[in-house]
Amino acid sequence: SKSCNMMTRNLRFAALLLLAGVFAAAPAVQGARPGKKKAQTVRLMDYNIADGMWYDQYNRYDRFVAWVRTQDPDVFAICEGATHWNEHKKTVSKEQMPRYLPDSLHLLAERWGHPYTAIGPYQDNYPVVFTSKYPIEVVQRIGEGLSHGALHVKINGVNYVVLHLWPQRYSMGDKTRKDNGGEAFRVEEMRRILDATILNPKFAGEKHWLMMGDFNSHSPLDKPFHGTRNYDVHDLVRSAYSHDIVGDWFSGEFVPSTTGGKARIDFIYCTDGIWDGVKRVETVHDAFTDKASDHRPIVVEFRTPKKTK
């Protein structure tokens, strides 16, 4: 009967809503907004969201979504894109994962207007991910020999690499935790990432690159503010990338990327063509970022180079 069919359709619709769960709790913003102006200017945000934004996990991510909407990035690079603790601070099981990140990243990203997502090699609880208003071409997921991995994507002719280097003083795999090999391991991670991306001969024709994320290491540009540290990671990076965007934009200043205000370990590097188009740079300080993570987000606006491959 018509009434039975109507009831069946209603039940199916209700079931679909339940499957969407917490990530569909708020209406999705419209996705890509095509237009010449948007295609020419990119607003990039890089953020280590700390344990898959565990801070707002039990609020249906409503505050996080509202905050991302106010920032309105075109491209969003995220470190620690997995939730691995449930509300009882127990490890999230495989059965629970569809409720959380990264399994439901696409549903969460839709809420802030990004219909496109990409997830790096999910080899531990700290994957890197991208969300975007524009189509994402996944060039490669880089995991071998790395702790948290790296993700290389291409969006509108620009190459983006997001990474998260090893955070400890000791090297990965050292069970004694006393070898003090952490920095050497980070250098090897960076060497692998550079060799796979910007230094790879097969990408010789690619001129426009950005590399970002949590480097867990210090820059020589900040030596006047914190004294001498080990700069091997960034010396290696600077041999391939000409600009540390925050360090060069705020030349002569110390702009920490941690909420504690004592360290700059999150970076966005770029090549000359990108740097020439940079219009705005900001490390975001507000009521949300003061509490949501131990890292602060970095926002960069740049004009897309005219010639992109």
What does each model-found stretch correspond to?
Residues 31-67, 128-309:
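Active-site regions of metal-assisted phosphoester/phosphodiester hydrolases
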